[in-house]
Every structure is written in C-alpha cells, then in structure tokens.
Curated annotation (Swiss-Prot):
Purpose of the protein: Transcriptional repressor that may play a role in the specification and differentiation of lung epithelium. May also play a role in developing neural, gastrointestinal and cardiovascular tissues. Can act with CTBP1 to synergistically repress transcription but CTPBP1 is not essential. Plays a role in synapse formation by regulating SRPX2 levels.
Gene behind this protein: FOXP2
Record-annotated DNA-binding residue ranges: 505-595
Cellular component terms per the entry's GO annotation: nucleus
Region CTBP1-binding: start-end pairs: 423-427
Biased composition (Basic and acidic residues): 327-338
Subcellular location(s) per record: Nucleus
Keyword Transcription regulation: yes
Name this polypeptide is given: Forkhead box protein P2
Compositional bias of kind Acidic residues: 700-716
Amino acid sequence: MMQESATETISNSSMNQNGMSTLSSQLDAGSRDGRSSGDTSSEVSTVELLHLQQQQALQAARQLLLQQQTSGLKSPKSSDKQRPLQVPVSVAMMTPQVITPQQMQQILQQQVLSPQQLQALLQQQQAVMLQQQQLQEFYKKQQEQLHLQLLQQQQQQQQQQQQQQQQQQQQQQQQQQQQQQQQQQQQQQQQQHPGKQAKEQQQQQQQQQQLAAQQLVFQQQLLQMQQLQQQQHLLSLQRQGLISIPPGQAALPVQSLPQAGLSPAEIQQLWKEVTGVHSMEDNGIKHGGLDLTTNNSSSTTSSTTSKASPPITHHSIVNGQSSVLNARRDSSSHEETGASHTLYGHGVCKWPGCESICEDFGQFLKHLNNEHALDDRSTAQCRVQMQVVQQLEIQLSKERERLQAMMTHLHMRPSEPKPSPKPLNLVSSVTMSKNMLETSPQSLPQTPTTPTAPVTPITQGPSVITPASVPNVGAIRRRHSDKYNIPMSSEIAPNYEFYKNADVRPPFTYATLIRQAIMESSDRQLTLNEIYSWFTRTFAYFRRNAATWKNAVRHNLSLHKCFVRVENVKGAVWTVDEVEYQKRRSQKITGSPTLVKNIPTSLGYGAALNASLQAALAESSLPLLSNPGLINNASSGLLQAVHEDLNGSLDHIDSNGNSSPGCSPQPHIHSIHVKEEPVIAEDEDCPMSLVTTANHSPELEDDREIEEEPLSEDLE
C-alpha cells in the first residue's frame, strides 16, 4: 500500500510539473487512431495513458534518486549529526511501483503492451531496484559513521569532566594544605612570642590610666572653682544678713585639693603632659571667664572614684544645696565606674549640638577629650546650658508654686477650722550641731521623674511654732456626693499623651487604673487580657517588666471587693461595683491612722513618722540655718530671690512661718533634709509628698487617688 501511494503521489506531481502538453498530444494521436478503428479506440487510449503514467513515474523517481545522491554525498561533510530516522522515510518515498505477475498477465491478455515494451519495463525496474539497494547501503554507512562520532564526543566529554573534577580536588587539597601551614605558623609564632598579648593589655591599661588621670585633673579643677563660687555666694549672703556663722567656726576657708598623693605642681605637670596642646594655667582659668555653678551637671565630665574624691565638708548652705551637690558627685562617680556617662547614651554623644556617633565608651572618651576640650567654644556652650538650666529652674519654681496653690485650694477650707491638729512648720530656726558638720551629708539619688524639693528641716525636740503664731487651719474631708458625678477620666485624661510617650510611672494606684480601664469600655466590662492591653496602650511605663505589674493587677482584682468577676459567653470578665468602690475609699481614710493626728505639742514630727520614712530621713540629713529668729516676714521674699539665683529649689515659704520668740531650740537638734517623695506613696499610711503634709491637715482627703494602694512592683 505504501508503494502504491508513493507511485500515485509521484505520478501526480510529475504530471503537474511536466504540464498537460504531452498528455494532450498523445490524446490527439489516440483520437486519430480511434477514427480509423473505432472499436479499439477506448483500449488504445487507456493503454497509452497507463504507459505515459509509468514513464512519468520512472522519470520522477530517477530525478529524485539523482538529487538524493548528490545531497547524500554532501551531507556527511556538512551535517554529521543527521538523525538516522530520516533514512526509511526517504527510501519509502523513493520506492517505485513494482509490477506483480498478475498485473503482467492482465497486460498480456489485454494486449496493451508489446513484449519489447515489457522487457524494457522490466529492465527499468531492475535498474531502479539496484539503485535502491545502493542507496540503502550508503545510508547505512552514514548512520554507522554518525553513531561512531556521537560515541567519540560522549567519551571526550566524560574525559573532560573527569579532568575538571581532578583539578578541583587538587585545588581543594592545596587550599587545605595552605590553611594548615598558616595555622602551624600562627601556633609557632604564639609559642615563640608568648608576651605579645600581655604587652597589648598593658598598653590598653596605660591608655585607660592616662584618660582617667586627665579626667581626674579636670574634675579637681572644677571642684576648686565650684568651692570658690560657693564661698563667694555664702559671703554675699552673710553680708546681706541672711546667714550668720557661729563664733566658734572659721569664716569658710577655701578647701584645698584632696591629698591623693599629688601636689598641685605635680597635677599641673600631669595635665600639661596629657593634653600637650591645651596647657592650662591658673591665670588662664581666671581670665577665661568659665563660670560653672553647682547645678551645671552637663559640664562635669567627672571620672573620680570614691578613693580620689575628697570628703568635702560644706558649711551652712541655703536649703540643701550641699547635699544635692554631693548626690550628683556620687551619681557621677557611680556612672563612670559602670562604663557610662551622662553625656553618652545609645551610642551618641549628648553634648548640646554634637550628636556624634561613638561605637563604644572608649571612643566616646576620645571624642570628648578631643572635640569638647576646655576652649572658648566649649565654654560658650557651657554658658548657654547654664542659662537653659536657670530658666528651667525658674519655670519649675513657678509651676511648683502654682501646684501648691491649687492643692491648697482643693484640700483646705479656712472657713471651717479644726483646732486639734497642728500643721507642720515650714521654716524653723535651728542651730547646727558640731557633730553634724563633721560628717558630710549623703543625699538620696535623684531621678528625672521625681522632682525633689528640699524642705526645710523639722526638729525632733519641742515644737518651735506656738499655736498662736500659726492659723488653726484644718482639712475638712469632702463627702463623696461632691465628686461622685465627676468622671475619673477628668483627672487622668489630660495626661494621656504624656504617659503614652514618656517612660514615667503614672501617679495612680492599680485599683484606680483598673477601674478607669473598665469604665472606659463600651459595656463596662473587660477580660483580664483586655485590661493588660489597656495598661500597655495607655502608659509607656507598663510596656516593660510585664510579669511584675501583671501580677500586681491580678492581685488587686482578687483582693478588692469592688471588682466583680462575671462569667459570660466571652469567658470571665471583670466589672466595677461603684458603691463598693466609693465605700472602700471612705474606709481607707477613716480607718487608717493619720500621720500627725493627735500628736502632743511636746513631741516632734519625727516621732510620728513610720519606719520607712524615718529610714529615708535618716539618710538625708542636712544642716540648714544656724541662728534662731533669723527668718522673718521681710526676709522670706529675699530668700526666694536668693533661691532663684542659686539655681536651687527652695519651696514656697509661708509668711506665717516665723519662729516664736518664746521658745528656744535645744542645743543638739538633728536637722533633716527631706527628699520629696514621688507622687505614688510607698505605703498607704505615708503621705503622698511632704508638700501636701506641710500645707494640709493630717487628715488627708479621701478623694485623692494616690492615697489608695501603692503603684509598685512589689505586689505579686
């Protein structure tokens, strides 16, 4: 069937290629023969057609064979990668039609062809068969050659891959050998030079010692200047008559440098050797105009330790300036020993207008000594910072007075006096004990979030103020109905933005905050996790130490009866019983012992303090004024002005706080410098601050949120 279809396609194509001219001519000849013999016209025409078709098929086959022979001779040279599957297709296309014996008999019977023509056809067929055999043999040879070439190429590729792998292995081995040799060399060097590391460590230690010596000299010079300025201030106050010195004491001698094994000449020589360029003379310091006060903490790049810093014994200074100075020195030395600095934080220099990035503390010290040395630019920056501090302290004193007036208005009612309790004296005239002068007072450390207002000392002996000298003003507790309708958010809401961004502990108890969280919700009920999320969302302080304050929240929820646990679809939720909450607040004031209630006039304020406050007061004792009858109504205003000039924090002095002339103080009276406590009381019985205690009756009001449970992390 394949051969027949091939012959048909070849005949059709040859007829289309050669045209219809030959066919038409033979048809014309057949028609002429048919005219002569009409009986055999149809037979002749069919025989001629068959004969023509066979001839055309043979011619087409010969042409194809010739073309393929020429292309076959060129193909092995041009395209060696020819596929062997193309060979049988071309052979099948070239196979001509073979005449079967049956077809021969039919042709003889019909007498279409003569015997000569048949012989010619047979010869042609034999020639075609020979050509086909030759072509098949040729194509077989080509296929074998292609297979051989492919095999050779594959072998070459495998050999190349093996060679590459061998080269890579050799390179890896060489690298390993080099690394081993380097390690051996390093080990040999370490064995040969064991003292190199020790030398490097010694060099680092020497550099650190040089930096420490440089900072020590600078600190000592600053201390000298501060002492001189303090002496000038005290002399000016003495001339004005505000401070009097007992006759047994000298007139404020100038403190010399500490005896740390170095004389002033040696210290000056050491300073010149360390700095090299910036040689500092005493005259240069005086004419340089460097004005440093005790409150300028930014210019004090101190690195003194407890061994190097001298125990300075200051004399009577207005309202606790000496203790503040000592506290700052102690805190600065503590920060230096802990590899920290006031001017260094989060890898950035905090010098005003600098903000240079320092990777470690050593690099910061180099930057500080190089860029911020004692020159005109640093001196000018220091003066600007002093002015900033002065303005802020003036603003702070004004705000404190405003707060005091607000608290006086809110918590005291002069129209309804209560004669039994006596308010605390604001200013008392005391004499300084010699034993107190020998030991330098230690002040409590200050924090930025707890503003300290040193309050004038309170005697432990008989009260200096008589009932006639002070108006009998008591605090009348307001009823709950006065403030029952005012929402709690009116006290917390104004400070939301501050507490949301600043890491400051809010001045409210856990109970108050939990109640506020529940009251702010839409359905007045919250789950425990929702309360936690309200705390962290509202206050930046609660975004750390989660475990501690969460325990305190759970403790408050289970402790107080005003918080009710309700089971619903969401689970366990907490609600607030407002009546129980208000009842609890009233019981808290009436049931707890007051601080100064029913104290006889023969007892001092120290006898009524609780244990925790007494311990705090014992640590922060400071002598103040030294003569009775010194402060009067006229001098209170002068003290206020002096307090602003000294950058201090003198509290507002009541004009009625003059001492009674009839009472004389005892010879040995311990004056107490009280650090103003943070807004949150450390104990329920403790007052929220000494300002409120001094301005109010001991019966503290019940509607102050801080009087409730302390907001401390100790509740677990």
